[in-house]
């Protein structure tokens, strides 16, 4: 029996589902295996992590962009169509995940049988439950020698409230149990519901930029139908476009005449900018537009800012072009030019979170062959002045110096940490050091614990995750989401060299930590900056008050070398002359900070973390 054609598929045979899993629990491998078993992928063209198209995705083993694949699967003589929507698993991309979940009716909760449930799995599971999806619990990697299937099955059953026997066991690597899983999807996931003759409404759950064809928009049709060559309207921007190509992905793009209720596919309109087709927006017919959008659209909001500067100043235009190109593929990326007296021309770039920042930087360096320096990541602070005005500070150099400051507000996040119970003490200690407020602590099983903390985002962006991993031998996992703002006692610490502030090294820190930050930074720069002909003071200051100082000793010539014996007044004359020369040099001399010193000092201030 041949598979139904796109555009004329009965919604009753469609099943839309996604896979929720923590990094490394085998989501992409399971997706590969499903593609092979349903015959969409033949053995010859199969490669590991078939759906992860970016090199970085394959190398790091993570999924950054969502993908959607249509697979036929026959049950009792009826060919069903399974649309698998592959979602990113990382906390930075939780908005993308929530949009992908909106496009589904069911979700596979995939858990590694050796490791058990992790924080991101749990966070995405809650998103799926909020979206009212049918959850199918699955244990993966049952072929591993270290798999503890029964224990983790009980854990999952306890969290989602099902019976242990309902937890399916598969091995994505060998293919064991995957056919049963496909049957279960057909049996359990509800068919999509929608009104076929209503005005079209389709949810955009991802958009990617293709160099040759412009933006490819992935959509899930909720009501009505979208047809080839008709005019469509984006409801959040009001922009109208013509559909140049429409089709499904199986697993390469297959053009079709249209898409109907419940179907998942792609559109190409010839638009060149991803910001024109925003994730979470609703697409409708321009001729007969829908009254109401599907709701839930949010504009992605950067949480973390960092300055990116080319090491070689002549690469600045290339960096601009590279960011322009990346933004075509990543609507959440925002940037504006900035200049630094120390680092020259560059950009202030806003990211969704730390992983997003790392990936963008790595893609700039790898795909565009740029050498970059990035300044320490900072968050957006709101400074309320006594005259009632508010200043948003994304860069320490924007911190107001004149006028009286009433209060400074900083973003906070609710963090969930899952860890083996033996590490509770060290995790609580870390969270307390980072100004956290404990919100709750629950045992998921006798030896796994869920710790909830409210933390300032600025305390997480540096190296919280690395510290957490090193304190728990890599077993703890972290998930966080924003929770508004709070007032805090924050100050701007300036680093002065020979009395001049170095803008790239300024930082906004909590008053309690300002002293240790200043001392550590001054000590670090003392090691890094080469000795000059004159004495150079390295100072850390809050406003006009110096809180720490180190002195880089001058290099001096031995002016007494030519005096054999001789009179003391002769020696004193030579020393006084040298001293006067050094003093004059200090007034006119400027200190050049070598680039290596910057890179080392900005390396997220490791020495400031010495416990």
UniProtKB/Swiss-Prot annotation:
One of its GO terms (molecular function) is GTP binding. GO terms for biological process: positive regulation of translation. Coiled coil: none annotated. SMART domains: EFG_C. It holds the Pfam family LepA_C. It comes from the Bacteria. It is a peripheral membrane protein. GO terms for cellular component: plasma membrane. Its EC number is 3.6.5.n1. GTP binds at residues 24-29, 140-143. Residues 12-193 form the tr-type G domain. Gene3D superfamilies: 3.30.70.240, Elongation factor 4, C-terminal domain (3.30.70.2570), Elongation Factor G (Translational Gtpase), domain 3 (3.30.70.870), P-loop containing nucleotide triphosphate hydrolases (3.40.50.300), Translation factors (2.40.30.10). Required for accurate and efficient protein synthesis under certain stress conditions. May act as a fidelity factor of the translation reaction, by catalyzing a one-codon backward translocation of tRNAs on improperly translocated ribosomes. Back-translocation proceeds from a post-translocation (POST) complex to a pre-translocation (PRE) complex, thus giving elongation factor G a second chance to translocate the tRNAs correctly. Binds to ribosomes in a GTP-dependent manner. Belongs to the TRAFAC class translation factor GTPase superfamily. Classic translation factor GTPase family. LepA subfamily. This is Elongation factor 4.
């Amino acid at each position: 029996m041949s598979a139904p054609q796109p555009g004329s598929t009965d919604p009753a045979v469609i099943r839309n589902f996604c896979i929720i899993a923590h990094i490394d629990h085998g989501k992409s491998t399971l997706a590969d295996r499903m593609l092979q078993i349903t015959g969409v992928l033949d053995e010859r063209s199969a490669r590991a992590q078939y759906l992860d198209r970016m090199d970085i995705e394959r190398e790091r083993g993570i999924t950054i962009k969502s993908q959607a694949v249509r697979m036929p699967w026959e049950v009792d003589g009826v060919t069903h169509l399974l649309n698998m929507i592959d979602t990113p698993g990382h906390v930075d991309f939780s908005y993308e995940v929530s949009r992908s979940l909106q496009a589904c009716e069911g979700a596979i909760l995939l858990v590694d049988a050796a490791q058990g449930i992790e924080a991101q799995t749990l966070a995405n599971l809650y998103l799926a439950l909020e979206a009212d999806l049918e959850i199918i619990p699955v244990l993966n990697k049952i072929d591993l020698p270290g798999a503890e299937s029964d224990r983790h099955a009980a854990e999952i059953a306890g969290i989602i409230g099902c019976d242990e026997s309902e937890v399916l066991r598969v091995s994505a690597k060998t293919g064991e149990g995957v056919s049963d899983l496909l049957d279960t999807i057909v049996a359990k996931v509800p068919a999509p519901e929608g009104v076929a003759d209503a005005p079209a409404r389709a949810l955009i759950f991802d958009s990617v930029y293709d160099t040759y064809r412009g933006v490819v928009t992935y959509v899930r049709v909720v009501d009505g139908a979208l047809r080839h060559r008709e005019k469509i309207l984006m409801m959040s921007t009001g922009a109208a476009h013509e559909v140049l190509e429409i089709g499904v992905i199986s697993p390469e793009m297959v053009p079709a005449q249209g898409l109907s209720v419940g179907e998942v596919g792609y559109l190409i309109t010839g638009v060149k900018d991803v910001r024109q087709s925003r994730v979470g927006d609703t697409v409708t017919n321009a001729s007969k537009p829908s009254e109401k959008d599907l709701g839930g659209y949010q504009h992605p909001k950067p949480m973390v800012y960092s300055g990116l500067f080319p090491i070689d100043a002549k690469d600045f235009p290339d960096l601009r072009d590279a960011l322009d190109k990346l933004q075509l593929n990543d609507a959440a990326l925002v940037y504006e030019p900035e200049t630094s007296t120390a680092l020259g021309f560059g950009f202030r770039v806003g990211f969704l979170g730390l992983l997003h920042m790392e990936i963008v930087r790595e893609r700039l360096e790898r795909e565009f062959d740029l050498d970059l320096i990035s300044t320490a990541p900072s968050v957006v602070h709101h400074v309320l002045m006594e005259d009632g005005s508010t200043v948003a500070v994304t860069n320490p150099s924007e911190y107001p110096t004149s006028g009286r400051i009433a209060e400074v507000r900083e973003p906070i996040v609710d963090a969930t940490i899952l860890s083996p119970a033996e590490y509770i003490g060290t995790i609580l200690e870390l969270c307390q050091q980072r100004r956290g407020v404990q919100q709750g602590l629950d045992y998921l099983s006798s030896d796994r614990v869920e710790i909830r903390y409210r933390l300032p985002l600025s305390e997480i962006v540096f190296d919280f995750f690395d510290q957490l991993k090193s304190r728990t031998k890599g077993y703890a996992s972290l998930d966080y989401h924003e929770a508004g703002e709070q007032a805090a006692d924050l100050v701007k610490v300036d680093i002065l060299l020979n009395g001049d502030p170095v803008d790239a090294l300024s930082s906004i820190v909590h008053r309690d930590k300002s002293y240790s930050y200043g001392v550590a930074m001054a000590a670090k720069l003392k090691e890094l900056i080469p000795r000059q002909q004159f004495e150079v003071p390295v100072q850390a200051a809050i406003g006009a008050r110096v809180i720490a100082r180190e002195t880089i000793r001058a290099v001096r010539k031995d002016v007494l070398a030519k005096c054999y014996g001789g009179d003391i007044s002769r020696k004193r004359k030579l020393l006084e002359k040298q001293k006067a020369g050094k003093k004059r040099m200090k007034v006119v001399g400027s200190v050049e900070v070598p680039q290596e010193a910057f890179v080392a000092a900005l390396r997220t201030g490791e020495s400031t973390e010495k416990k």
